[in-house]
């Protein structure tokens, strides 16, 4: 069971994790543009 959970976790966590990462990247880019 642990192997199945280990393989399933990344599949479910990636779609949930990447939107937050993209938002952070956009926030950093907008901050960099405003600073420049």
Curated annotation (Swiss-Prot):
PTM note: Processed by the macrocyclase-peptidase enzyme POPB to yield a toxic cyclic nonapeptide. POPB first removes 10 residues from the N-terminus. Conformational trapping of the remaining peptide forces the enzyme to release this intermediate rather than proceed to macrocyclization. The enzyme rebinds the remaining peptide in a different conformation and catalyzes macrocyclization of the N-terminal 9 residues.
Locate the cross-link: Cyclopeptide (Val-Pro): 11-19
| NCBIfam families named in the record | amanitin
Give biotech applications: Amanexitides have a structure closely related to antamanide, a cyclic decapeptide with antidote activity against amatoxins and phallotoxins, and might therefore exhibit the same activity.
Protein name as catalogued: Amanexitide proprotein 2
Assigned keywords, A-Z: Toxin
Q: Would the keyword GTP-binding be found if you checked this record's keyword annotation?
A: no
Enumerate the propeptide ranges.
1-10, 20-36
The protein's superkingdom reads: Eukaryota
Q: What does this protein do?
A: Cyclic nonapeptide that belongs to the MSDIN-like toxin family responsible for a large number of food poisoning cases and deaths.
GO molecular-function annotation terms?
toxin activity
Q: Which cysteines are joined by disulfide bonds?
A: none
The answer to whether UniProt assigns keyword Lipid metabolism to this entry is no
Tissue expression from the record = Expressed in basidiocarps.
InterPro entries from the UniProt entry: Amanitin/phalloidin
The similarity comment for this entry is: Belongs to the MSDIN fungal toxin family.
């Amino acid at each position: 069971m642990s192997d199945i959970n280990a393989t399933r976790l990344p599949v479910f966590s990636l779609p949930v994790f990447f939107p937050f990462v993209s938002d952070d990247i956009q926030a950093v880019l907008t901050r960099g543009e405003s600073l420049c």
